[in-house]
Amino acid sequence: MSEKTIYSDLKQLGSNASIPQNPEDAILERVANPQAGTPYCVRFTAPEFTSLCPMTGQPDFAHLVIDYVPGQWLVESKSLKLFLFSFRNHGAFHEDCTVTIGKRLVELLEPEWLRIGGYWYPRGGIPIDVFFQTGAAPQNVWIPEQGVPNYRGRG
């Protein structure tokens, strides 16, 4: 008989899970934080995030940086990857994509703090950067700068 662990209820990790057709169908999974009560920051970086323009259907590209200070829960990284991939065929503006990702994670994890930076590549000659966070960053945790430089063309 196998012993139940914090990973026992995960459905996607270790299985052949397909990319959901859209973000609404994506299942984000969480695991109990074995270091709950210890203040620390978790960072996920998605340098090749893609979605579709809802008007033209053309692809949009972004560099996403997600930082959070966990409470009782951690996001399972394969489920996060599949959730982010589900935006590939989803039409929404940059602001909607970025804030939706942040809100879904907050709803799932109930973190002490979370922020997401969406650094979108230019469309129509204008880069769009979108930032969402749940409040002031905790003072007792090292939270590095996101480190994504401002977009700069020639010059």
Curated annotation (Swiss-Prot):
One of the protein's GO biological processes: tRNA modification
Residues noted as binding substrate in the record, renumbered to the chain: 75-77, 94-95
Enzyme type, top EC level: oxidoreductase
GO molecular function: preQ1 synthase activity
A single cellular component GO annotation: cytoplasm
Its EC number(s): 1.7.1.13
Pfam family, one: QueF
Entry keyword set: Cytoplasm, NADP, Oxidoreductase, Queuosine biosynthesis
Location of this chain's protein in the cell: Cytoplasm
Catalytic activity: 7-aminomethyl-7-carbaguanine + 2 NADP(+) = 7-cyano-7-deazaguanine + 2 NADPH + 3 H(+)
Pathway, per record: tRNA modification; tRNA-queuosine biosynthesis
Keyword NAD: no
Active-site residues, Swiss-Prot/TrEMBL: 53, 60
Record InterPro entries: GTP-CH-I_C/QueF, NADPH_dep_7-cyano-7-deazaG_red, QueF, QueF_type1
Biological role: Catalyzes the NADPH-dependent reduction of 7-cyano-7-deazaguanine (preQ0) to 7-aminomethyl-7-deazaguanine (preQ1).
Family: Belongs to the GTP cyclohydrolase I family. QueF type 1 subfamily.
Name of the protein this chain belongs to: NADPH-dependent 7-cyano-7-deazaguanine reductase
Gene source species: Brucella anthropi (strain ATCC 49188 / DSM 6882 / CCUG 24695 / JCM 21032 / LMG 3331 / NBRC 15819 / NCTC 12168 / Alc 37)
